[in-house]
Amino acid sequence: MSQLTIALTKGRILLETLPLLEAAGIAPLEDISKSRKLTFETTSPDVRLLILRGSDVPTYVEFGAADVGVSGKDTILEHGSTGFYEPLDLRIAKCRLMTAGIAGETLKPGRIRVATKYTNLAKQYYAEQGRQVDLIKLYGAMELAPILSLADEIVDIVDTGNTLKANGLEARDHIADISSRLIVNKASMKMKHQQIEALIDAISSAVNERAAA
């Protein structure tokens, strides 16, 4: 049987993905959280795990360095590729992609500045709104941008909204609902169809059982 490579990313998505993989008979032989390794053998001899930066997972899957990956819908949309299949919503790491700004302030007319790490999604969203924007690419501490007048709005992931409130900001417009998805390389789906279909079925069952619990 061919080896199957699954790309994951550390953090919340990994913590919520591992139980789904375990339900499919796949568990790392080492504690990922205590290791600096980037590849891990598993209890299934024909499956190995890769630990990547979240934004890199779609790229590894698209170009076949990984057969399967788990990625947030925000990352998939920002990546913008049609180079892989997206057969399953894992219904984990749920949140929303939203605009946000200073609480109580009205957005000024005309051209605005928007800070975000999702520049492609933001460009598309504001174009659909008929709004001209200058985009500022940031990688973290997004809430500081409106506070320090670097930007009029931000586009970011919102979970509870508590971080926004703690920094005097408010969520504004909803852009997309986000959750983690299983993605599959197109060539791998053809070459390793039986293995991948079995994996999808097993994980899908685990997702449904979790939802019913």
Curated annotation (Swiss-Prot):
Pfam families: HisG (PF01634). It catalyses: 1-(5-phospho-beta-D-ribosyl)-ATP + diphosphate = 5-phospho-alpha-D-ribose 1-diphosphate + ATP. Pathway: Amino-acid biosynthesis; L-histidine biosynthesis; L-histidine from 5-phospho-alpha-D-ribose 1-diphosphate: step 1/9. One of its GO terms (biological process) is L-histidine biosynthetic process. Its EC number is 2.4.2.17. It comes from the Bacteria. GO terms for molecular function: ATP binding; ATP phosphoribosyltransferase activity. Keywords: Amino-acid biosynthesis, ATP-binding, Cytoplasm, Glycosyltransferase, Histidine biosynthesis, Nucleotide-binding, Transferase. The keyword ATP-binding applies. It is found in: Cytoplasm. Its main location: cytoplasm. It is an enzyme of class 2 (transferase). InterPro entries: ATP_PRibTrfase_cat (IPR013820), ATP_PRibTrfase_HisG (IPR001348), ATP_PRibTrfase_HisG_short (IPR024893). One of its GO terms (cellular component) is cytoplasm. Gene3D superfamilies: Periplasmic binding protein-like II. Belongs to the ATP phosphoribosyltransferase family. Short subfamily. Lacks the C-terminal regulatory region which is replaced by HisZ. NCBIfam families: hisG (TIGR00070). Heteromultimer composed of HisG and HisZ subunits. Catalyzes the condensation of ATP and 5-phosphoribose 1-diphosphate to form N'-(5'-phosphoribosyl)-ATP (PR-ATP). Has a crucial role in the pathway because the rate of histidine biosynthesis seems to be controlled primarily by regulation of HisG enzymatic activity. HAMAP family: HisG_Short. This is ATP phosphoribosyltransferase. The lineage of its organism: Bacteria, Pseudomonadati, Pseudomonadota, Gammaproteobacteria, Cellvibrionales. The gene is hisG.
